[in-house]
């Protein structure tokens, strides 16, 4: 199995390094990751400047000023030859649950892999300690995919409780929960009297029902949420069409 491994925490982050070490026991792994923390970069792509790379002695590649999406795009189209069999993103430091997936560079890297035609996993740890647990879960999933490919056309967003592996209760297939919108902005004054702003923490859980990713992780289970690239709200198609007819948009301007 050939694995392109990326993240949004940066090439030296403990999550990606722990996972790379575990995966290299049974797979051919190429790390292509940002040279710095790009958390919250979502699906952003660098279009107005060129991208430089640096290759470390162990073969890991850092993309200077690159986003997670840049890294997967370059990895698939230029840097990993032969091309990968699968794209893996993580292990993220902290969860990507509910609405987090909108902003997550970890999820975006996997989405880019899926968009380019490859199976993809995004893996996050609900904390900052037991990366070995998340690595073991990821290895088990990848071995399963090697034995029997999952042909859903979706990515798997995997969130792992921050527990020793022996304390993880199992695995659940979940849906994304949701949070209250975060509205906190933290202003500060710099030494010259100018105001600068920090984005505040995420909102509290709003929808954390028993079938959500929030509930699974809180209860000690690995959460696996299938996600897809198509953002079309198919269930709203007829409602929007009827509304356009009702208000006359398209028949008169």
UniProtKB/Swiss-Prot annotation:
Main enzyme class: hydrolase
Signal peptide: none
Cofactor annotation: a divalent metal cation
NCBIfam families: PRK00346.1-1 (NF001488), PRK00346.1-3 (NF001489), PRK00346.1-4 (NF001490), surE (TIGR00087)
Binding, a divalent metal cation: 8-9, 39, 92
Gene Ontology CC: one annotated term: cytoplasm
Compartments where found: Cytoplasm
Gene: surE
Function description: Nucleotidase with a broad substrate specificity as it can dephosphorylate various ribo- and deoxyribonucleoside 5'-monophosphates and ribonucleoside 3'-monophosphates with highest affinity to 3'-AMP. Also hydrolyzes polyphosphate (exopolyphosphatase activity) with the preference for short-chain-length substrates (P20-25). Might be involved in the regulation of dNTP and NTP pools, and in the turnover of 3'-mononucleotides produced by numerous intracellular RNases (T1, T2, and F) during the degradation of various RNAs.
Protein's UniProt name: 5'/3'-nucleotidase SurE
Example of a GO MF term: metal ion binding
Pfam families per record: SurE (PF01975)
Record keywords: Cytoplasm, Hydrolase, Metal-binding, Nucleotide-binding
Main localization of the protein described in the UniProt heading: cytoplasm
Gene3D superfamilies, per database record: Survival protein SurE-like phosphatase/nucleotidase
UniProt family annotation: Belongs to the SurE nucleotidase family.
Domain of life where this protein originates: Bacteria
Coiled-coil stretches: none
EC nos: 3.1.3.5, 3.1.3.6, 3.6.1.11
Organism: Salmonella typhimurium (strain LT2 / SGSC1412 / ATCC 700720)
Cofactor note: Binds 1 divalent metal cation per subunit.
Record has Cytoplasm as a keyword: yes
Catalytic activity of the protein: a ribonucleoside 5'-phosphate + H2O = a ribonucleoside + phosphate; a ribonucleoside 3'-phosphate + H2O = a ribonucleoside + phosphate; [phosphate](n) + H2O = [phosphate](n-1) + phosphate + H(+)
